[in-house]
Swiss-Prot record:
Role of this protein: Protein S19 forms a complex with S13 that binds strongly to the 16S ribosomal RNA.
Homology family: Belongs to the universal ribosomal protein uS19 family.
A GO CC annotation given for this chain: ribonucleoprotein complex
Source organism (scientific name): Ash yellows phytoplasma
Molecular functions (GO terms): rRNA binding
Protein name (record): Small ribosomal subunit protein uS19
Keyword vocabulary terms for this entry: Ribonucleoprotein, Ribosomal protein, RNA-binding, rRNA-binding
């Protein structure tokens, strides 16, 4: 779930 949040928060990454 943490990874999913990071991707949503950082679409550039």
């Amino acid at each position: 779930a943490v990874i999913l949040k990071a991707i949503k928060x950082n679409p550039k990454k």
